[in-house]
Curated annotation (Swiss-Prot):
One of its GO terms (cellular component) is plasma membrane. GO terms for biological process: cobalamin biosynthetic process. Pathway: Cofactor biosynthesis; adenosylcobalamin biosynthesis; adenosylcobalamin from cob(II)yrinate a,c-diamide: step 7/7. Belongs to the CobS family. It is found in: Cell inner membrane. Joins adenosylcobinamide-GDP and alpha-ribazole to generate adenosylcobalamin (Ado-cobalamin). Also synthesizes adenosylcobalamin 5'-phosphate from adenosylcobinamide-GDP and alpha-ribazole 5'-phosphate. Its EC number is 2.7.8.26. This is Adenosylcobinamide-GDP ribazoletransferase. It comes from Pelodictyon phaeoclathratiforme (strain DSM 5477 / BU-1). Pfam families: CobS.
Amino acid sequence: MLSGLVTALRTLTLFPVPGKETDTFSRSLFWFPVVGLLLGSIQAALGYFTSLLGWNELSAAFVVLGGIALTRGMHADGLADLADGFWGGRTRESALRIMKDPNVGSFGAIALSGMMLLKWIAILKLVDIGAFACIAAGVLLARWVQVLLASALPYARREGGTAQSFVSGAGVVHIVVTSALTLLFLFPLLHADLYANLYAVVAMISAALAAALLTGLLSYRKIGGVTGDVLGAGSEVTELFVWIAAALSAALKA
């Protein structure tokens, strides 16, 4: 079972995990919330300790850039590829072809820049009020959404691809188990946060589901399923939606 954790860490992070390569791709999905909690905790800690410098704008920037660094920029790259393909390709085939191009086009650059700016704004609000647990929760929920997308939609590329091994083995059991794990981690995590009341928790979970629905429907309509880029983009969109929901909830509470 731990081989699934190894695969999840190798896939989702830059951490050098020792051991042999395994083919436990579908089993690794069960560990996505665990890895999300780990990454989120690191980003939250990064935000907290840099905020002690008294320069919250810089702290928020460290959280955004830290998230990109911890994932080797993989999810950010997926967002850029998705934007280029979905808005630059008129047909399913052209969209998939553009998404496979390693070069970033104008749509991708705009999407990536906009995402980083909006994340920075939302995180700055959370840092200002000390809601660091909400930062971790956003990363946790984003990895859960990746499992939802992989389990609910077929793989889009007929010729196969990197993420096919994850998507082809995903199913209802992955949704059930990861949903339980996500809730198990989420409520204790946010219980310690002064600003994360029940309404905020509901708002954050709803924001994550909205991100999953938006990404899933758009991807199914455009390319008939998901790819690795779609899963990465879904993670990015979820983080943004959850952090905005948390920031708005805190503002309304205040």
